[in-house]
Structure formats: structure tokens, C-alpha cells
Amino acid sequence: GENQSSHYNKFYFVKILKIVEISYKSVRPSLSIFDLWADLLRRSAVSSNFGLIMEEISIDIFNLLDKQPEPARGNVLLAKPTVDDACFKRSVILLVDHDSEGSMGVIVNRLTDYTLADVIDGPDYFQEIPLYMGGPVGLNQMFFLHTLGPDVIPNCIQVARGLYFGGDYEAVKRYVACGEPVEGKMKFIVGYSGWEKGQLADEISRFDWVIQKHIDEALIMGDQEADDMWKAAVESFGEKYRTWNNWPTNPSDN
């Protein structure tokens, strides 16, 4: 009822205040707590939707963060916590290609319910090798990210130090079929994330993404749950971004 709604609104207002106070202070230490209260009161006076209030505040906070570098192959894109697209929410994306005509990346923390056995005939242990969803484009295509290099997988592309993308499909099949280790060395990915000319730059300018130039190979090739990998990536981005881990997973549900 109305009283219950009012109770929840008060509860989440206090909750939001604490999160936003920490976030604002991390990027604007001179901010007065009284100014913060006034800002939140002003916003709540025109909207009872706390998801919307947090989205507005997030824009203010993220616009105070450091200017983002130009994206390049091998960079990691980290979705800001208020991105609510089902595919990209709390995603960690490795850019495998970028030029003036567009960009291509793969989400590395979106595990599916499928295994390699669902797409390739092979030994029973193929059922133990997970498939990841790399993005909404080309879902009928499978890609592989690995640390093996061209000596093992010819024709692969080096995307970062010690990290490779693609290569000779038959060589990959032979490697896996022989029972060679896969965990931490290979990720099989269905689909990819693509951006047309200028599209990624626009999204970065809105702070939908932040860029990490120096990637953690162990993190990218790890098998953490999606949210855990995203939080670990946030930690690697430094102090200004750590308050993102305080952000509710589903603020609009509030």
C-alpha cells in the first residue's frame, strides 16, 4: 500500500545517500554533505523512481572521472554499473579489433548453459568445457581466446601480451581432442560485440564504458561468475572506481 511504499522510499533514500556520498567524495572530495543532501532532496521532489534518480546521479559522478583514452585492440571495456541492457549489464569486454571503421570485442564473463560438446563432436570431456556468450552479433559463430600462441594455434591474432584470438580451427580441435589443458588457457565464445564507425566512441563519451589499457590475463581467462569478474575488474581500475561495487545490481527494482 501507500504507507509501505513510503517506508521503502525512505529506506532506499538513505541507502542511496550513503552510496552516492562515497561515490561523489571519491571524485570530488570538496563536496559538502549539505550540498549532497540538497541535490538528493531536489531530485526526489520530482521523482519517486529511485532507479531514475540513481541513473541521473551516476551521469554526474561518471562525468567527473578521468577522460578516457582512445580504444585500441587489447583494451578491456568495463560496463558502468547503471548499464541495464541484458547483454551488456556488468560486462567485461576484450577488444580484439579496432580501427577507424569500427570495433569488435568479446564479453569474457558471460557464461552460457552450453558446453563445447553442444557445438563440436568429440570425447565425453567436451561436456566439461564451457561456452561463453561474446555478444549479440554472430551467434551462429564460435570464436576462441587463448594463451597458446601461433606455435600451437597457427594464424591466430595477438591481441595483447600473451593473449591471442582465433587461429586455425583444425589445430584447436586437435589440441582439445588430445586432452590438453583448457582451463585458464582457452575460452570458447559464441557471438561477439560489434560497433560501427564512431559508435563505440559515442558510448565511451557517455561513460557507458571505461577503458583499461593494461589487461590482467589471469582475470580475462578466469572462470569467475559474471558479477565476481566484473567486481574484480572494477578493483583493478583503481580507487576512483571502487565505489561502483557498492552500486545495487538492480537499482530500478527499488
Descriptions of predicted regions:
Residues 3, 16-22:
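Polybasic, lysine-rich low-complexity intrinsically disordered segments
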Residues 2-8:
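Short, charge-rich patches within N-terminal targeting peptides
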Residues 55-189, 193-254:
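A short aromatic-anchored loop/beta-hairpin motif
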Residues 8-13, 24, 34, 50:
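Aromatic (phenylalanine/tyrosine) cluster motif
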